[in-house]
Curated annotation (Swiss-Prot):
Name of the protein in its database record: Shikimate dehydrogenase (NADP(+))
Keyword annotations of the record: Amino-acid biosynthesis, Aromatic amino acid biosynthesis, NADP, Oxidoreductase
HAMAP family the UniProt entry points to: Shikimate_DH_AroE (MF_00222)
Binding annotation for NADP(+): G131, A132, G133, G134, A135, N155, R156, T157, L158, K159, K160, L229, G252
Family indicated by similarity: Belongs to the shikimate dehydrogenase family.
Species this chain originates from: Halothermothrix orenii (strain H 168 / OCM 544 / DSM 9562)
Active-site positions on this chain: K70
Gene expressing this chain: aroE
Main enzyme class: oxidoreductase
UniProt pathway: Metabolic intermediate biosynthesis; chorismate biosynthesis; chorismate from D-erythrose 4-phosphate and phosphoenolpyruvate: step 4/7
Length: 289
């Protein structure tokens, strides 16, 4: 039952048809007995500024931000957290009395997933990131902060990848970062010698599932950890390709839960562990690839 004291949070993006966040958050709020509700807020690009202003006008407690707005929301916020500023992308906004502050819990969620669900130690490893959007910024920051020796960024638009690599080279001067085109002849010898491949693109996401994996199966070895941040469907074409060669695989569902749990703490002040437990228990194990 909603009343005047109900705290409203939500997910801001476009489109939102694939998202499980509302069901996940509302399940946790119900189980924990807190007076919150989580709403999908599909906002077309021409109305992003008005959408942000609406958070103040309607006194929302905050929102998560997803594709395509993680970078675009920043100019409309009053303040951003240090990590979010370093990454250059925001996925969580907190409204404190009309003052909007941006955070990035994607980075925290990704780090926890690698450590807890993949048992993967980043330090000294060679990593491949596919895609140069907001999620790749968070992933790259985690890898660099935790001491990866080399990071290769693959993107269809090489110019966009090169721009992000330029930022990383300045922010993390001790880490070798290289931009490569999604051209099999160029990336194949590099990717085959890497320890982890992380796909941050929406390729293979429901409902628009089509085509093969974003990189050639020949680039994956049985010693590679293959991570696809897409979680619906649980087995993307990239995950399937990884399994076919005997590689370890992980989809993005644990990261989704963890980043949500950290956002939950920012909004409610409640420990993220209390969010994680009921959500994990309610989710089919099929989601954990």
């Amino acid at each position: 039952m909603f009343d005047n004291s109900t705290q409203v949070v939500g997910l801001m993006g476009y489109p939102l048809g694939h998202s499980m966040s509302p069901a996940m958050h509302n399940r946790a709020y119900k189980d924990l007995g807190i007076n919150y509700v989580y709403l999908p807020l599909e906002i077309k690009p021409d109305f992003l500024k008005e959408g942000i202003e609406g958070l103040r006008a309607f006194n929302f407690r905050g929102v998560n931000v997803t594709i395509p707005y993680k970078e675009k929301v920043i100019p409309y916020l009053d303040e951003i957290d240090r990590l979010a500023g370093e990454i250059g992308a925001v996925n969580t906004i907190v409204n404190n009395g009309g003052k909007l502050k941006g955070y990035n819990t994607d980075a925290l969620g990704f780090k926890k997933m690698l450590e807890d669900d993949c048992s993967f130690e980043i330090k000294g490893t060679k990593a491949v990131i596919i895609g140069a959007g907001g999620a790749s910024r968070a992933v790259g920051a985690v890898l660099a902060r935790e001491g990866a020796s080399e990071i290769f960024l693959l993107n269809r638009t090489l110019k966009k990848a090169a721009k992000l690599v330029g930022i990383w080279n300045k922010t993390y001067p001790g880490i070798k970062t290289v931009a490569l085109p999604l051209d099999e002849d160029k990336y194949l010898p590099v990717v085959k010698r890497c320890d982890v491949i992380i796909d941050t693109t929406p390729v293979g996401m429901a409902p628009g599932i089509k085509g093969g994996p974003v990189i050639a199966k020949e680039a994956i070895t049985r010693d590679t950890l293959v991570v696809d941040l897409v979680y619906n469907p649980p087995e993307t074409t990239l995950i399937k390709a990884g399994r076919q060669v005997g590689a370890r695989t992980m989809n993005g569902f644990p990261m989704l839960i963890y980043q949500a749990a950290y956002a939950f703490k920012l909004w409610t002040g409640i420990k993220p562990e209390l969010f994680i437990k009921p959500v994990r228990e309610a989710i089919s194990p099929d989601f954990f690839a």
